[in-house]
């Protein structure tokens, strides 16, 4: 091997090392209708405004929540990547302010029919997201189905969205209980962070967190972190009706500022090496169970 070729190989290896793992954050809820997907799109926008490249992966089976929130109909979805030969970049739909999203479509539901080699190829394709994004937001389904749990136990960071309504709090605890009982769950590798949505006052969100945190710590060995609260805001309702996130439609609103504050908290949190697993390892954990 000549000196020039050796130098080229060294540069190639250095460039490969420079590819950083994307930060993977799952957003979930114990029940539907509490603002989970709304949280996903607004957090994505706030990360993007801080200079991050953000892609939302819509893993809410059969429900096109993200495309509805953005008012955008995607040309391709995950099924086109899996079954129709499309490349990963082709199925990423451009959204507002540079945020991209991948629609699950019917593709996720068909995963059960894939053999191991097909799943390996799928994971290989999805792992390219490490090069295309700094932050991946996984918008999971609501509730405690096995498909939701597979995403949560693999996720180094999970944001649990709840409201002060008793049914929402009860369902949030049920989700945490199901998570704690999953054989693949590890409290060291899966950090759960709470957002209290639709609160009347900030104190209401803090009280909700303290109560849920106390019982989850005592009975489930899950230590919740508190990210903050989103208040009742008519601007959110108006933004939803026009199929735009409130952070885009009303950037000066109270709720938009709260989403910004939450992302600032997330940005200031140090990510340990065993929590910065990247996209490849995340999807391997989801789809390639031992």
Per-region residue spans from a language model:
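Extreme N-terminal, non-catalytic leader segments
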Residues: 1-31
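Walker A/P-loop NTP-binding active-site region of P-loop NTPases
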Residues: 24-88
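P-loop/Walker-type NTP enzyme "switch/lid" segment
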Residues: 59-131, 241
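Short, hinge-like loop/turn segments at secondary-structure boundaries
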Residues: 71-76, 178-179, 210-213, 246
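Conserved catalytic-core segment of NTP-binding enzymes
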Residues: 140-228
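Beta-strand-loop-alpha "switch" segments that mediate conformational coupling across diverse proteins
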Residues: 218-245, 258-261
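NTP-binding/hydrolysis catalytic cores, primarily Walker-type P-loop NTPases
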Residues: 245-290
């Amino acid at each position: 091997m000549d000196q020039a070729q050796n130098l080229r190989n060294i540069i190639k290896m250095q460039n490969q090392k420079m590819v950083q793992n994307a930060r993977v954050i799952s957003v979930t809820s114990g029940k539907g209708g509490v603002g989970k997907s709304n949280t996903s799109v607004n957090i994505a926008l706030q990360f993007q405004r801080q200079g991050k490249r953000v892609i939302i992966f819509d893993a809410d089976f059969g429900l096109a929540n993200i495309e509805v929130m953005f008012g955008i109909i995607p040309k391709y979805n995950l099924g086109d990547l899996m079954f129709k030969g499309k490349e990963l970049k082709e199925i990423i739909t451009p959204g507002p302010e540079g945020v991209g999203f991948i629609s699950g479509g019917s593709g996720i539901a068909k995963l059960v029919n894939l053999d191991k080699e097909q799943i390996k190829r799928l994971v290989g394709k999805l792992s390219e997201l490490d090069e295309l994004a700094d932050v991946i937001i996984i918008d999971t389904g609501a509730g405690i189905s096995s498909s939701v749990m597979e995403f949560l136990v693999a996720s180094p960071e999970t944001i649990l969205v709840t409201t002060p309504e008793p049914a929402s709090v009860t369902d949030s605890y049920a989700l945490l209980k199901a998570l704690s009982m999953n054989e693949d769950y590890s409290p060291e590798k899966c950090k759960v962070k709470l957002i209290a949505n639709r609160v009347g006052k900030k104190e209401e969100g803090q009280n909700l967190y303290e109560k849920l945190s106390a019982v989850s710590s005592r009975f489930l060995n899950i230590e919740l972190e508190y990210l903050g609260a989103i208040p009742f805001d008519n601007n959110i309702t108006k933004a939803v009706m026009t199929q735009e996130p409130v952070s885009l439609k009303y950037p000066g609103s109270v709720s938009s500022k709260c989403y910004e504050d939450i992302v600032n908290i997330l940005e200031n949190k140090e990510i340990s090496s065993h929590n910065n697993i990247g996209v490849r390892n995340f999807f391997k954990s989801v789809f390639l169970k031992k």
